[in-house]
Amino acid sequence: MGTDISDIVVSHETSLKDQGNQTFSIDTYNILYQLLSNVRQYDGMPLMDSHGNVTSHLYGIFYRTINLLENRIRPVYVFDGKPSPLKNRTISERQMMKEKAKAELEEAIERGEEDLRQYYSRINYITPQIVDDTKKLLDYMGIPYVDAPSEGEAQASYMTKKNVDGVISQDYDCLLFGARKILRNFAIYGRRKVPRKNIYKTVYPEYIILDEVLSANQINQDQLIGIGILVGTDFNEGIKGIGAKKALALIKKEGDIKSVLKHIGKNIENLDEIIDFFKNPPVVDYDFKFRKPDTDAIEHFLCDEHDFSRERIRDHLESLRKNDQASTQFRLDSFD
């Protein structure tokens, strides 16, 4: 998902602890897709309660949010609104990929394959129920969230220009939307299996500073947007044969994306609209506040309604209580 400009991005390995005492907006759908793909049973099926409701997202949001709070990182979750019409092609392609994955899963089951994880992990849907349950859990935990009018990553990036320190997301598109700082791999760090390969790699959290990316490549924000569009974004197909490094070289030589397209004899549909969307996306001003967690409601919701282990939940609820007391003074200092 998003644009792949990783080859020209300056990143720094970091840790949760090193990012403490800061507030970050979170591209929630981006995180939910990661959780639905990675938090699964041994056979690849998503975690479910006794009623057949998917709970992978609740498991991930609960434990990862507490982990952030324990490291004095204050999260503000941002939910997607109505997608831009520019994204229709991407949405259709993703739906086709899921349908293909479902067909491959059925074939694998018929063949009697035992390891179905690679198939299940490619079939993820963020349903209204998943969104509602996530918001309900965040409400009980006292964690604020913002409903974006359109793209969540655009709203989360906009918030970095106001009073949050950065955005937590895997997508480099946040840089095109002007996010001052991005934290990546904060939901999937550690030893991870490479998709569709029987090998593992260690993934470390990292941060990216927009100004460093621009300075290191000697470009401006408009040129960075042009590079992303040449490579391809959720709103357009990239130009075949052009990766981030080649796009950078072309942009620096020709000056801007329109000059590049004229030089190579190519066209990108809706170019002006795409550029404008990255520069002026639909966003809202917001007011958020961290509240005291309702630990009884959390326990009832997770344990009584969704079959979570009461013993495990209570251990983490105690951590949540302690964290709330420890962070109250800092929150007052930060947001008054």
UniProtKB/Swiss-Prot annotation:
The keyword rRNA processing does not apply. Keywords: DNA damage, DNA repair, DNA replication, Endonuclease, Exonuclease, Hydrolase, Magnesium, Metal-binding, Nuclease. Residues 1-98 are annotated as: N-domain. Mg(2+) 2 binds at residues 171, 173, 234. InterPro entries: 5-3_exonuclease_C_sf (IPR036279), Flap_endonuc (IPR023426), Flap_endonuc_arc (IPR019973), HhH2 (IPR008918), PIN-like_dom_sf (IPR029060), XPG-I_dom (IPR006086), XPG/Rad2 (IPR006084), XPG_CS (IPR019974). GO terms for biological process: DNA repair; DNA replication, removal of RNA primer. Its cofactor is Mg(2+). Binds 2 magnesium ions per subunit. They probably participate in the reaction catalyzed by the enzyme. May bind an additional third magnesium ion after substrate binding. Mg(2+) 1 binds at residues 27, 80, 151, 153. SMART domains: HhH2 (SM00279), XPGI (SM00484), XPGN (SM00485). It comes from the Archaea. Residues 115-255 are annotated as: I-domain. One of its GO terms (molecular function) is 5'-3' exonuclease activity. Its EC number is 3.1.-.-. It holds the Pfam family XPG_I. Structure-specific nuclease with 5'-flap endonuclease and 5'-3' exonuclease activities involved in DNA replication and repair. During DNA replication, cleaves the 5'-overhanging flap structure that is generated by displacement synthesis when DNA polymerase encounters the 5'-end of a downstream Okazaki fragment. Binds the unpaired 3'-DNA end and kinks the DNA to facilitate 5' cleavage specificity. Cleaves one nucleotide into the double-stranded DNA from the junction in flap DNA, leaving a nick for ligation. Also involved in the base excision repair (BER) pathway. PANTHER family: FLAP ENDONUCLEASE 1, FLAP ENDONUCLEASE FAMILY MEMBER. HAMAP family: Fen. Belongs to the XPG/RAD2 endonuclease family. FEN1 subfamily. Interacts with PCNA. PCNA stimulates the nuclease activity without altering cleavage specificity. This is Flap endonuclease 1. It comes from Thermoplasma acidophilum (strain ATCC 25905 / DSM 1728 / JCM 9062 / NBRC 15155 / AMRC-C165).
